[in-house]
Amino acid sequence: MRNIMIIGTGGIGSYLVDFLSRIGIYDITVFDDDKLEEKNLTYQNYIPDTVGQTKVSAVNERLKVNGLKLVDEQPYLVLVEKQLKGYDLVICCADNLAVRRMLYRQGYGDDAKLKWLDLRAQGRNAALISYKVNENLVDDLLAGSEGSFSCQGGDWDGSPEQVNCMQIAVAGVASQWIQRWFIDNENVADKMVLNV
């Protein structure tokens, strides 16, 4: 089995877990300390019966309903680098820069202490950034305000008509990237940007 850690099971992570579970060849551990709220149902991959549960527990409930392989639930924040050890690939779907910075400190290219993937979506834009990225781009990639943000973007008014779906697009692209990376890690992009 291929051992994957996914940090964050919101807009991107909830779809990524589903895609990778369907494939059935991954051992997945998910970290997220958030609880599922009703407002999340509009753009995150959850079922209404799980509102109020931790997102990692709600992920398994949905996987169970669909007869898919369950994940290892870790309803905690990722706070220290030690938590990143022991995985073939660590994937950040979290909505804050502190976790991303910790991941990027693991290094780049052949010198990376661990292999990582950073997935982001905001409004009509999304990005996949891997440990293969040119280190000279890092300052730009890690620029921004502290704290968390919605993958829907700051101008989303909460209405279904205004929902953006880039979190689903980047989760799908990442699933394909992960499949290719485990087969031939030399033949994958260092980064991808999607905008509609």
Which ranges hold each PLM region?
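A structured beta-alpha segment of the ubiquitous adenosine-cofactor-binding alpha/beta core
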Residues: 54-89, 94-98
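Glycine-rich phosphate/adenylate-binding loop
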Residues: 84-89, 93-196
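Glycine-rich adenosine-cofactor-binding loop
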Residues: 2-25, 29-35
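Short, well-ordered alpha-helices that flank and scaffold nucleotide-derived cofactor binding pockets
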Residues: 18-22, 61, 105, 180
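Alpha-helical elements of the RecA-like P-loop NTPase motor core of helicases
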Residues: 14, 39, 101
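Conserved beta-strand scaffold positions in the cores of enzyme catalytic domains, especially
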Residues: 30, 72-75, 116, 191-193
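Glycine-rich phosphate-binding loop and adjoining beta1-alpha1-beta2 segment
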Residues: 25-68
